[in-house]
Amino acid sequence: MVSPPGVLSSLLLLAAMAGGSSQQCSEGRTYSDAIISPNPETIRIMRVSQTFSVGDCTAACCDLLTCDLAWWFEGSCYLVKCMRSENCEPRTTGPIRSYLTFVRRPVQRPGQLLDYGDMMLSRGSPSGAWGDSLEDLRKDLPFLGKDGGPEETTEYSDEYKDLERGLLQPSNQQDPRGSAEYPDWSLLPSNEGGFNATATGDNSAASMEKLQDPTPHPLDQEQLQALNESTWSPTPGHSSISSVWPSSASPLPTEEGLEGEETLQLQEQPSNSSGKEVPMPSHNPSPASLESSPATTEKNSNFTVTPRSRKHSTPTFPTSTVLTGLTPPPWPLSPTASRTVKALAVSAGDNLVLTLPDREAELKASVEPAPPADTTYSYEWSLMSHPVDFQGKIKQENKPTLHLSQLSVGLYAFRVAVSSENAFGEGYVNVTVMPAARVNQPPVAVVSPQTQELSVPLTSALIDGSQSTDDTEIVSYHWEEVDGPFLGEEFPADTPILRLSNLVPGNYTFRLTITDSDGATNSTTASLVIRDAVDYPPVANAGPNQTITLPQNTIILNGNQSSDDHQIVLYEWFAGPGGESKEMVMQGAQTPYLHLSELQEGEYTFQLMVTDSSGQQSTALVAVTVQAENNQAPVAVAGPDKELVFPVQSATLDGSRSSDDHGIVCYHWEHIRGPSAVEMENVDKAIATVTGLQVGIYHFRLTVRDQQGLSSTSTLTVAVKKENNSPPRAQAGGRHVLILPNNSITLDGSRSTDDRGIVSYLWIRDGQSPAAGDVIGGSDHRAALQLTNLVEGVYTFHLLVTDSQGASDSDAATVEVLPDPKKDGLVELILQVGVEQLTEQQKETLVRQLAVLLNVLDSDVKVLKIQAHTDVSTVIVFYVQSGSPFKVLRAAAVARNLHKRLSKEKEAFLLFKVLRVDTAGCLLKCSGHGHCDPITKRCICSQLWMENLIQRYMWDGESNCEWSVFYVAALALTLTLLTGAVSWLCICCCRRRKRTKIRKKTKYTILDSMDEQERMELRPKYGIKHRSTEHNSSLMVSESEFESDQDTLFSRERMERGVLKGSLNGCARNGVSFGYYSKDR
């Protein structure tokens, strides 16, 4: 949270003017390896960031008028304000980097500035710290105990000397802890004292009442002189302020100070921080900072100060309040030319507090002393802070009186600057606009129902009071029993709904009292009547009177309509008066149903007596009338007259609509009149056929007879005419487009026309159309053809219409069935449950479980079809959509994800056991070298192609046809040859190694001299040169223990040698030396 901008501007001005008075501040006693007892009730501590040395910390304490002690602890700077001298007594501690430096100030401080600065910085947390709570201090100062004092420390002895100057040398190291844990020492004070309260939200009124921004007193001559020594240096695009800050008593220049002006960076205080922020001093200002031109100074809503280090970013002000830049004095300031300015006591009046709907205010500035006769004061009003939504009007900004209108809720800070040629003064005032006060409306208690009547065994009831209303909030409900039987101590009294149980008969009255958040109450009552159980006698009902006609002599009387408030335990049927002597058979006389048979003509009366569980009885009578058999003559109906057009092959005579009360047993057709004789078939049946009709009028008579011999006749006229007939015109309906999964359609041929009417329709499927698809209810012989279960493809149906004269016409209708656009996203889930056992509620539960597994919404899982897979399994076809607009996810990815999630979950995660999860259609591309089997969902590869076994069994497991049989065979042959070659090479190497082993020394003897051409050289088997000398003989024999020929090798030397090599005994003229030559290998 951030303080109001008005307080920020006042604090900036205070810091600028404090620079003049702090020039007399000097460094006092210093202590090393020492701490103080930071009791929050006696001292106040503020942590300062962006300090690089003990000297910086001491200078910061000098710059703050309320600071008494600069504490440098472990690379961090803390400013301490001591209420009393004994509160800041140094104490010794262990070998840690802790230095205490007391500052010396003049006895006479500027009273106005001191009071104002103390008040500005003392409005902190109740703990007494300027910005750091006790918990935050414990993070920085680990030696603090729970009471806030040091642990195991002793008082500092007088033998401690002043701190060496080397400790005051600047350090370029920055506090490694940063601003994440500690609030930075910046220009913005905390909100806990009321400086950061905003005028928005529900709590604005409470926060505004705490905020009282005082107006500073008139400046004395010394303070104005210090103000004249300050400089105003504009920054491009912003209004910035640079002040000459005094250093400590013995300032040590830092590297940053030598390079240029050191200024402070404005940093925004985090909202959860309770610390205040104080401006960081700048030392050794450069001459450039002392130059300013008022002509280049402009107003801006943002205050920017050059950062001390480029490593820190420049934060921004909060958006809840808008700051207006400070306006520099109207006269030019120069560090080399000082002038005397008279201080004016300017008052902008008391702080104003307005409450909506009051949106106007008037601010008036008063100045002391009054202007001389020849001089007038210039007034300049500036709005330093206002709410973000401020759109009001400000009038007469350059006059003593400022008119404000159309103010919105929030805090406004105004500054008025009064100046003349040699005088200057300024004042501040706050205007707070509070929201309109709310008028509380009392709550309205509502109970439902207000009246209830129950009868035993119902002994429980509910009374709902949750429908009660209030303009804010109902905080409590209280039920109490006003009248009725006592309910005991377990009576639920503080719930919106009153639940009652185990009630006894009686009249109850309950009162509900509700209370809202403002303490207003309202009550209402509800009544409840519990009645005792009443046992009413049963009501017997034997049913209505019955009448039957012989030969029917059986009937069933039904008494199950009898009723009782509890239960009927006994049914009894009796023959009524006048029926005891008649013969009949009664069955089920003690059941609700009485079966009567062998009844005779006459009237019967039967009595039903019912008995309930308490023994109460009731009776009812029913009459059964048996009438004598009454035969009526049949009625012959030959049908309507017919008019036929010649030529006609045959005509149908229909007498099936003839009727009789007992049934017709005989039909007879006869030709009674006509132009020529005709041939008739089935003349003794209800429907007869006539052929051989010629042009003329024919009369046929139908005679029917019943079982009693009664008969009846009817005549039919058939007129055969010769006239022209126009053929019908068939219209099948044209072309239709159907998109799966919608696989049903109706083709309408009723628009076919004929001059005398169409008598028959016939739909014929074209031979090139798909065979799949069913005709519903024989509609292929009707005007409208109904089709279902169509598959992807183009269907052609021919409509053949025929009129009464046999003329016909045909037309074709085309149905193009397009594939389902969601086909690639359909997933097939087979569950171990019969399709007849799967209910709608279980289906919705399955959808929710699938949505949880797939991490989607329930509405994203769409079930298209549920059908039987086997007698004990059901297949569910669904797809999953996501995104906006909706996009159907790929079935392969959904099936793979669902299979993976099911393998990780418990076995009983779904309602039923999952038998298989796969795509509904076969979507495999098979690498373009095969096709996908729709049953097994596996690729069937073409000839000379096979499956990539590595991808199938080691990677994603998707069936494919990526490998060529030739390539695989060539690779296998290559690997086989390579394996054989490597094996052969290894065997050869092993044998060679075995042959090179040194054998036992072999002895040789010289053979007899032989012909020079048969000279041979005897050599060891493995080429090892013998140590024996050369001999002249050409042949040598071994005398070793092994006489085998396998131990010696003979090689024939070439007859001629260029140069004979010498041996130990010299050269032999007729022989060569015995040795090893690599070429003999």
UniProtKB/Swiss-Prot annotation:
Residues carrying Phosphoserine:
1009
Comp. bias (Polar residues): 197-206, 222-234, 283-307, 314-324
Sugar-bearing residue positions: 196, 228, 272, 302, 430, 507, 522, 545, 560, 742
Localization (cell): Cell membrane; Early endosome membrane
Record PTM text? N-glycosylated. O-glycosylated.
Q: Which residues form the PKD domain?
A: 345-436, 444-533, 539-629, 630-723, 729-820
Question: According to the UniProt entry, where is the signal peptide?
Answer: 1-22
What topology does the record note for this protein and the membrane?
Single-pass type I membrane protein
> Residue ranges for motif Endocytosis signal?
1004-1007
Segments of skewed composition (Low complexity): 236-255
What biological-process terms (Gene Ontology) are attached? central nervous system neuron development; multicellular organismal response to stress; negative regulation of axon extension; negative regulation of axon extension involved in regeneration; negative regulation of dendrite development; neuron migration; positive regulation of SMAD protein signal transduction; response to auditory stimulus
Q: Where are the transmembrane segments?
A: 965-985
Q: Which Pfam families match?
A: K319L-like_PKD, KIAA0319, KIAA0319_N
Q: Name the InterPro entries for this protein.
A: Ig-like_fold, KIAA0319-like, KIAA0319-like_C, MANSC_dom, MANSC_N, PKD/Chitinase_dom, PKD_dom, PKD_dom_sf
Q: Which residues lie on this side of the membrane: Cytoplasmic?
A: 986-1081
Provide Extracellular-side residue ranges.
23-964
Function as written in the Swiss-Prot or TrEMBL entry: Involved in neuronal migration during development of the cerebral neocortex. May function in a cell autonomous and a non-cell autonomous manner and play a role in appropriate adhesion between migrating neurons and radial glial fibers. May also regulate growth and differentiation of dendrites.
Q: How does it assemble?
A: Homodimer. Interacts with AP2M1; required for clathrin-mediated endocytosis.
Q: Protein name, please?
A: Dyslexia-associated protein KIAA0319 homolog
Source organism: Mus musculus
Organism lineage = Eukaryota, Metazoa, Chordata, Craniata, Vertebrata
Q: Which gene encodes it?
A: Kiaa0319
